[in-house]
A protein has these predicted regions:
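Short amphipathic alpha-helical elements of helix-turn-helix/winged-helix folds
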Residues: 28-32, 107, 142, 172
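Hydrophobic alpha-helical connector segments
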Residues: 70, 84-113, 162-169, 191
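Amphipathic alpha-helical packing segments from all-alpha helical-bundle domains
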Residues: 77-80, 107-110, 127-153, 163-167, ...
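Short coil/turn segments at alpha/beta junctions that flank glycine-rich nucleotide-binding fingerprints
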Residues: 35-39, 111, 153
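N-terminal intrinsically disordered/low-complexity leader segments
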Residues: 1-20, 159, 206-217
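Helix-turn-helix
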Residues: 20, 24, 28, 32-66, ...
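Short helix-capping/turn signature of helix-turn-helix
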Residues: 61, 118-124
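Hydrophobic/aromatic-rich alpha-helical bundle segments in the mid-to-C-terminal region
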Residues: 116, 120, 129, 151-197, ...
Length: 217
């Protein structure tokens, strides 16, 4: 008698990638890793957090190591998406700076516990190291290309090399995101202030932002 194939075994890679249960497991894994750390986290912890069976986990992931790497890819993509700024005129440097800064700070603050783990795991895992480097570098280089393009068109007069400006803005955004992770009420002020400094470095001549939100003391 032919062996009956389980329904899940016939799913395509696309089906598994798009499945709500997969997203549920990823969200649960991020929470568990943030709470317990990488070493102590188990697949049982993740499935319990997701309220799914252990068998469901193996439909989508082969191991704890794999789901951690998939999370790293998701975080990398979140930072790249932060620079997409849909609905914003890409020739409007001030609007792009504000929208991309807001999205970056939000994403970094939201994923901060996982980012700390990624940095640790990057010391011993080559795959995670590559993803960590992409998280650090790809948004910076994309921003630098944008600055170069507008500079070549005469729309910007950056105070330094575009790559240096992009690195400076990235560093400021990370520091403010860490503050926001501790004090979410500082989000609006963080976006306002980083945007103002970003525009100064771009040489846009934009007027300083007026204080409208809470400030740290």
């Amino acid at each position: 008698m032919a062996r009956r194939q389980q329904p899940w075994a016939t799913r395509t890679a696309r089906d598994r990638t798009d499945a709500p249960a997969r997203t549920q497991l990823l969200d649960a894994a991020e929470s568990v890793f943030a709470r317990r750390g990488y070493g102590l986290a188990t697949i049982a912890d993740i499935t319990a957090e997701a309220e799914l069976s252990r068998a469901s986990f193996y439909v989508y992931f082969a191991s704890k190591e794999e789901i951690f790497r998939v999370l790293a890819v998701r975080v990398r993509d979140a930072f790249l998406a932060a620079q997409e700024v849909p609905g914003v005129d890409l020739d409007d440097a001030a609007a792009v700076a504000e929208a991309s800064t807001a999205a970056f700070i939000s994403a970094y603050a939201r994923h901060l516990p996982l980012l700390r783990l990624l940095e640790q795991q990057a010391q011993t895992d080559d795959d995670v190291r590559q993803l960590w480097e992409e998280i650090q570098e790809r948004p910076v280089h994309r921003a630098a290309r944008y600055i170069r393009r507008l500079s070549a068109d005469g729309r910007l007069a950056p105070v330094a090399d575009p790559l240096s400006v992009a690195r400076a803005v990235g560093g400021m955004s990370i520091q403010f995101a860490r503050l926001v992770a501790q004090r979410p009420t500082e989000y609006d002020a963080a976006v306002r202030d980083v945007t103002a400094m970003y525009l100064h470095l771009l040489g846009t001549g934009a007027a300083p932002c007026e204080p409208t939100g809470p400030r740290s003391t």
